C-alpha cells in the first residue's frame, strides 16, 4: 500500500528524542558510552529517533545507518562502540560476521537495542550469547512518532510504555470493545502530547497484553508484552489460531534451522499448514 507520511513539530521531535533517550538509559547507556546507530536513516524513523535519543543522553553517537558490514565492524572496533542499535536480524548477522573474522575480543559492546521487526525470545538469547551483551526490545510505529513508544528495562519482562505521551488500551479486534488489563487483544494508542499528527485510539493491529505490575527497575509505567502477532496476519488452521512468531520460536529452539517458509493451503475442504525449513550445515 501507500507509504505512511508522518509530520512533526520541533517540540514533537524533542519529545521523541526524550522517549528514545529513556530507552537507551533503561539499557544502561550514559554519557560515557559510544552508541552505534545502525538503523536506516533517510525517511525511516529508526535511525533518526535513536540518533536523537543518543545525543540527548550525551553518548558519542555514530550515525552509521544500515548495511555496509565492513564499515560497521571497523567503527565498532576502532571507536569502541558499547551500545548497538539496529534490527535484531542485522544484529544476528553482525554477530556471525564478528565470529567469522575472529573479532570477538576486539569488540566491546555491552548492550543492544533491537526493534523494527518481530523477534523471538530464543533469538534474543542467541544474540546475547554470541555478542556477549544484553539485548533490549524497543517498540514504536511511524504513526505515533517512531521507536521509543515503549522499551525494555534491565528486568526484560516487558516493555514500559511512555504513558506521559501515549495512552495504551487493549481492544477486541472484532468488536472494538475495550478489554481489561491482562487480557490478550489488539493494542491501540492515543497520543496526548504530539502536536503535528495526533491520533485517537489508533489501531496498531498488534496482538499483545498490557500489565501494570511492580518492576524491579522502579519504573511504574504500564508494560506491554512483546507483540504475539498481528490481527491481520494471524493464521486460523482447523479452528486453531496460529501466530508465525510462535512457529519461529519452536524452530529456533532446535538450534539447526536457518530460513523457513510457512505455506497455508486448503486441500479437500481441509486447512493445511506446511513449514519448509532450511537446515544449517
Can you name each region flagged by the protein language model?
Residues 1-15:
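Conserved AMP-binding A3 loop
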Residues 14, 41-44, 92:
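Short, small-residue-enriched loops and turns at beta-alpha junctions
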Residues 57-281:
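Active-site glycine/GP-rich loop and adjacent strand/helix microenvironment
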Residues 20-59:
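Conserved AMP-binding loop of ANL adenylate-forming enzymes
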